């Protein structure tokens, strides 16, 4: 199992880095869009959309919202509406998250709150990554920075949690996560941000960049817990089986759903 997980991770990671640095933005948008659609399909399944017709309608809704926002040019980093839209997204997610914690659905019952939450997490996350990739000459490197940040946070949290972990972060949703692991992930993110200043040749506020990185790192934990809550409510261990040793696509992008939109929105203020 571990060998399979490492092999899948190595192949997926290598291909992702190559695509981000080599592909033009339209090509990357198509490739990443396919990846996100698979994640959206898994989200629909976890939300108890049991028929093919309902799942296809759900995918259509995701695609239509994506096209609509893109057409309105809200995914442009220079647009003042972009931070406002993502702020609204954050508020909606917070409200729906609270609702999801309080009100559990019966097994097999379609969860419309989760479907709505899926629209306002999957779509902004996807558009944020594509927007940052095509926004500047160093956009591909910045997108890679965001993706690698989550890997760094996960790695730091894993080793810190394994060494010092005692206090459970969310025993019901994710028994393996501890507060010590979260702190370890944030410490790793701090050093990563300092290295990123030089790698990206960052010319704006260094303190602001580090703080934005730490905010995104913190929110990545929220995204992870959010997906854990969705899977728990659906009675599923993984979001899917498409990635051997890793589960589904959602299991790989859950941290991005919360972190990427806010990080990219924060870039608009520099």
Go through each PLM region and give its residues.
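Membrane-embedded alpha-helical bundles of polytopic integral membrane proteins
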Residues: 2-214
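Generic detector of well-ordered alpha-helical packing
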Residues: 6, 43, 155, 225-228, ...
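Hydrophobic alpha-helical transmembrane segments of integral membrane proteins
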Residues: 120-121, 240, 257-258
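Hydrophobic transmembrane alpha-helical segments of multi-pass transport and channel proteins
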Residues: 217-222, 249-257
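Transmembrane alpha-helical segments of integral membrane proteins
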Residues: 222-238
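C-terminal transmembrane helix pair
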Residues: 231, 256-262
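Interfacial loop-to-transmembrane junctions
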Residues: 233-255
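Juxtamembrane boundary at the C-terminal end of a transmembrane helix
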Residues: 264-270
């Amino acid at each position: 199992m571990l060998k399979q997980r490492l092999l899948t991770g190595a192949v997926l990671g290598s291909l992702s880095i190559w695509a981000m640095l080599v592909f033009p933005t339209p090509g990357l948008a198509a490739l990443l869009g396919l990846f996100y659609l698979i994640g959206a399909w898994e989200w629909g399944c976890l939300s108890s959309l049991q028929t093919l017709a309902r799942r296809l309608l759900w995918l259509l809704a995701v695609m239509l919202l994506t096209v609509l926002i893109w057409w309105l040019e809200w995914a442009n980093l220079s647009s003042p509406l972009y931070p406002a839209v993502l702020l609204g997204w954050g508020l909606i997610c917070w409200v729906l998250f609270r609702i999801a914690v309080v009100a559990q659905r019966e097994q097999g019952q379609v969860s419309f709150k989760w479907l709505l939450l899926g629209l306002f997490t999957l779509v902004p996350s996807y558009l944020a990554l594509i927007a940052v990739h095509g926004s500047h000459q160093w956009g591909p490197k910045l997108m890679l920075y965001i993706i690698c940040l989550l890997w760094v946070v996960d790695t730091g949290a894993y080793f810190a949690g394994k060494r010092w972990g005692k206090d459970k972060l969310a025993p019901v949703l994710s028994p393996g996560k501890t507060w010590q692991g979260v702190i370890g992930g944030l410490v790793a993110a701090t050093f990563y941000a300092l290295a990123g200043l030089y790698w990206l040749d960052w010319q704006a506020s260094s303190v602001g960049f580090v703080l934005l990185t730490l905010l995104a790192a913190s929110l990545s934990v929220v995204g992870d817990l959010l997906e854990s809550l969705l899977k728990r409510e659906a009675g599923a261990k993984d979001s899917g089986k498409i990635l051997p040793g890793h589960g589904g696509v959602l299991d790989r992008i859950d941290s991005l759903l919360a972190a990427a939109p806010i990080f990219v929105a924060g870039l608009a203020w520099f």
